Amino acid sequence: FKEGDRCQYYHQIAQGAVRWVNTNHDGEEYLQYLAESGESIGEFPLFDEGVYAASAIAVVPTTVWRLPKSRFLHLLREHPDIHFAFSALLVKRLRFKFFLMKEIASHEPRQIVLSLINYLKRTSQHICMECGQILLTRRQIAEMTGMRVETVIRAMRQLNDQGLIAILDRKAYCEGSKGCVPGTCKTHG
């Protein structure tokens, strides 16, 4: 779906990954959310009769399950436990947006990137919990924070120089990580 389209379905990613982005008049993208297998996207207009707030773009070949809006709302009414779990998910995403806006307001790229990495580590998102590898590209971090890729690269180099992250073989790792030692991480070799 595209930003501005009318919502007719609940969407859940069965397999793959989807970027949920806004594009400005210059064609620059702002990454609102990177959804992976098992996650839903585009939920807002299911509840407020508005249009999609952002566009969904598959990152890799992706299978998405769609449930008509009326059936989804009926499901929530009939199963309060699902409704509460779904509400908790929306609150978690809203809390992340508040966090990110606060950090962006600091205007310090190094601090914005470090805070984002720490948040992702704390919430076990886009960080390999075995080896500490940051599973977002520098471009994705730039799109999430509204910074230029070059600014993110500089900030990450500074964080590496300060020992707050490690950059090994062009991959970034959380503080205290020694990198992905071959044969030790089930996810990365």
What do the predicted segments below correspond to?
Residues 1-15:
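Regulatory nucleotide-sensing modules
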Residues 10, 32, 64-65, 133, ...:
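A residue-level structural signature of the nucleotidyltransferase/glycosyltransferase Rossmann-like core
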Residues 17, 61-63, 171:
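Structural motif
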Residues 25-32:
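Short alpha-helix-to-loop micro-motif enriched in aromatics/charged/Gly
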Residues 32-91, 95:
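Cyclic-nucleotide recognition modules
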Residues 77, 81-148:
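Polybasic "coupling" helices that flank or enter modular domains
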Residues 121-189:
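Phosphate-/nucleic-acid-contacting segments
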